[in-house]
A protein has these predicted regions:
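A short glycine-rich, Lys/Arg-flanked "PGG" loop and its adjoining helix->strand segment in the class I
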Residues: 156-168
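N-terminal, positively charged/glycine-rich alpha-helical extensions of SAM-dependent methyltransferases
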Residues: 20-42
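A short acidic, Gly/Pro-enriched loop at the edge of an enzyme's catalytic core
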Residues: 131-142
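Class I SAM-dependent methyltransferase SAM/SAH-binding core
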Residues: 74-78, 82-132
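A short SAM/SAH-binding and catalytic strip from SAM-dependent methyltransferases
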Residues: 142-154
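Conserved class I S-adenosyl-L-methionine
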Residues: 173-197
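Conserved alpha-helix/loop element of class I SAM-dependent methyltransferases that forms part
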Residues: 52-72
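Short alpha-helix
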Residues: 200-217
């Protein structure tokens, strides 16, 4: 698999998106290391083989829980990679979705898939570091991220950035794992394939996320630990939902 055929086009799109959305932060392509085309290809192949059943149910739950079906505006998937969740969200919402990922080598594949499904006009991509998001304050109507936050070196800073970018009244849904509507049989099969590498202390993670919210002064938040019937032996993951308060309405009559 080669992702570089349309990379020039993708970079131009990234730069255009960046020019529209921010002016004070510069884009820099990552230098070598783990953010490579080879890494992107490996993740895409792994996702196809293992995680493909996860995204449809997750998108379905997100749209239902946050009433996104008729909502318009901007949605951001932070750390979206190949953008499979965005494709599923495009099928169910009217939002324009932005794939914000630190590895731009995903973007050619992402655009190809979006165009294949008829959503090329409803998506954008931009290289983004969670610790310094390239968006204006109060920019996004919804921010989601699956399977990324545990890689962030400074989680307090990253979650603070997400909060900054949310519009007043908007919500973020950040986590790892599955949605409660994913059949237990499928979840069990995925965990069995993943083995020990996806074992983590959910209780410890919940405490960590709660501490981050308190440090940032975010009061309107909720930690979800999906536990559908029959899933007692399956780790369904953990999700953090938090809201940015709406702007206060000034009573000019007073």
């Amino acid at each position: 698999m080669r992702l570089s055929l349309r990379f020039g086009f993708v970079v131009l799109t990234i730069l255009f998106c960046g020019a529209c959305n921010f002016s004070s932060k510069s884009l820099q392509l990552p230098s070598g290391g783990k953010f490579t085309e080879e890494k992107a290809v490996a993740v895409i192949k792994g996702s196809r083989a293992m995680l493909a059943p996860v995204y449809g149910p997750l998108a379905e739950q997100i749209v239902e829980d946050f009433d996104l079906e008729e909502k318009t505006g901007i949605g951001i998937d932070l750390g979206s990679g190949q953008g499979t969740l965005i494709i599923e969200l495009c099928k169910r919402t009217q939002l324009h979705w932005i794939n914000a990922d630190i590895n731009p080598h995903y973007f050619a594949y992402f655009y190809e898939q979006a165009e294949k499904h008829g959503f090329g006009h409803r998506v954008s991509a931009i290289m983004a570091d969670a610790h310094s998001l390239p968006f204006h304050d109060d920019y996004a109507d919804f921010i989601v991220s699956r399977g990324s936050f545990h890689f962030w070196k400074d989680k307090v800073r990253a979650f603070g950035e997400i909060y900054r970018v949310l519009k007043p009244g908007a919500v973020a849904y950040i986590g790892r794992g599955f949605s409660a509507n994913l059949p237990v049989e499928i979840a069990s099969q995925i965990r069995a394939k993943q083995g020990k590498k996806m074992k983590y202390d959910v209780e410890k993670t919940a405490n960590e996320l709660s501490s981050i919210m308190k440090e940032l002064g975010i009061k309107d938040y909720c930690i979800h630990r999906p536990k559908p019937p029959g899933s007692e032996e399956v780790n369904y993951g953990i999700w953090l939902e938090f809201h940015k308060p709406p702007d206060k309405v000034v009573d000019k009559g007073r």
